[in-house]
Design a protein with these regions (language model features):
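Class I Rossmann-like S-adenosyl-L-methionine
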Residues: 1-196, 295
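Rossmann-like S-adenosyl-L-methionine
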Residues: 163-419
Length: 419
């Protein structure tokens, strides 16, 4: 890292470490304001800023109010998060900074004393996890989310096949391999400018974590069916389900945010999908939903959640969420799941999912729903995936984690309505 890159990183961290805005939004805004920054500059700034987020527990132990000392925070991130030797950056340092980094390296063993610093997790989250996990499980989780995430992409089966697309990417020197579970997935260990790639522009490829691809498999949409994506967002899972249906049948994509649904429309066009009807709703109780009561073959609820399964990509979330925000989400999730269940026809399927690792948002939410809705029963996810020739057994629920499965942390439950 050179002096100019360090200066830019410090300016980014001064804003990012207040945790008032999503980190990716802060970074994008900064790069828009500094259009002359080259590709390598942006890479160095982004990697160091995200290293500061991943190692914020240790940095905040060494520095009071890191956002008020962003240059030191950036230097600490280089040493703690990017394995930079002090000798490599000695020309950037004054005497005080050299002493600070020397003390920081000397304190590395001290940082392992507290579970929150050892796992790089805030105290509130450690306390939540301690209700269900052992100390070793918490430490393993902390290690897994501090690893950079690969880029997973999905082959749109309307436009191509994985066994044809994969060799093309490998021929371009992309470090590409088939995902181990999803039959449509490709994993890129080295990120490329996919949004400019011909196969992305023509709709053959779509960015999507393997966990989300498996969720689309669990929905099990068939041609000619009525499908509801109750919390569609920008529509990544909607598109995967649509490809399964080959434009035969109808998908209703609902969301409360018009902006997110607006992003779905160009993606539909690029993917060659014509059977998706997107509509903004005011809430899960919107009267426009009532017309589908008891008519849907499949209903997907990718519920609003804490997002704590995505910490590899969004390390700031653990500081932007709290026990209070999670508690508020629980009632919202329950209300949405209850409302969505009314759309499912007899023998139809209701799939509940989150990108959280907290049992309160996951298993406990499903157990509460089943206790209130005896007309539904749980379908074993492992058996369902086995029937789809997916060799993955996480039990009756789909539970994915970054350490074991190299995906985002993910949860799903499949519920079937009885006759």
């Amino acid at each position: 890292m050179n002096a100019a890159q360090l200066d830019h990183t410090a300016k980014v961290l001064a804003e990012m470490l207040t945790f008032k805005q999503p980190s990716d939004a802060v970074l994008s805004a900064y790069f828009r304001e500094h259009k002359k920054l080259g590709r390598q500059d942006r890479h160095e700034i982004a990697e160091t800023a995200f290293a500061a987020l991943r190692h914020y527990q240790k940095i905040s132990t060494a520095l009071r109010r890191p956002h008020a000392q962003p240059r030191k925070a950036a230097l600490a991130a280089l040493v703690l998060g990017r394995s930079t030797n002090i000798s490599q950056i000695k020309d950037l340092l004054d005497e005080e900074e050299t002493e600070f980094l020397g003390n920081l390296k000397a304190r590395k063993t001290e940082f392992s004393d507290g579970l929150n610093t050892a796992a790089e997790l805030p105290q509130w989250l450690v306390e939540q996890l301690q209700q269900h996990w052992s100390e070793e499980e918490i430490l393993a989780f902390g290690r897994s989310i501090n690893q950079p995430a690969p880029l997973d992409i999905r082959v749109n089966t309307l436009k191509g096949k994985r066994d044809k697309v994969l060799p093309l990417l490998q021929a371009e020197s992309a470090d590409a391999e088939a995902t181990p579970y999803s039959p449509w997935g490709i994993r890129l260990k080295n990120k490329i400018a996919l949004n400019k790639h011909e196969l992305f522009l023509d709709g053959t490829l779509e960015v999507q974590d393997e966990g989300s691809q498996l969720l689309a498999l669990l929905v099990g949409a068939k041609r000619g069916e009525i499908i509801v994506d109750f919390c569609a967002g920008a529509g990544g899972k909607t598109l995967a389900v649509g490809a399964q249906m080959a434009n035969k049948g109808r998908i209703y994509a609902f969301d409360i945010a018009e902006k997110r649904l607006a992003n779905l429309k160009p993606r539909m066009t690029r993917a060659g999908l014509t059977n998706i009807h997107s509509e903004r709703i005011s809430s899960e109780h919107d009267t426009r939903i009532a017309r589908l009561a008891g008519k849907a073959d499949r209903v997907l609820v990718d519920a609003p959640c804490s997002g704590l399964g995505t910490l590899r990509r969004n390390p700031d979330l653990k500081y932007r969420q709290s026990a209070e925000t999670v508690a508020n989400l629980l009632e919202q999730q329950h209300s949405i799941l209850d409302a969505a269940s009314k759309l499912v026809k007899p023998q139809g399927r209701l799939v509940y999912a989150t990108c959280s690792v907290l049992p309160e948002e996951n298993e406990l939410q499903v157990e509460r729903f089943l206790s209130e809705h005896p007309e539904f029963e749980l379908v074993n996810c492992a058996e369902l995936l086995q029937s789809l020739k997916v060799d993955l057994d996480t039990g009756k629920y789909l539970r994915l984690n970054s350490g074991e499965h190299q995906t985002d942390g993910f949860f799903a439950a499949v519920l079937q309505r009885k006759d």
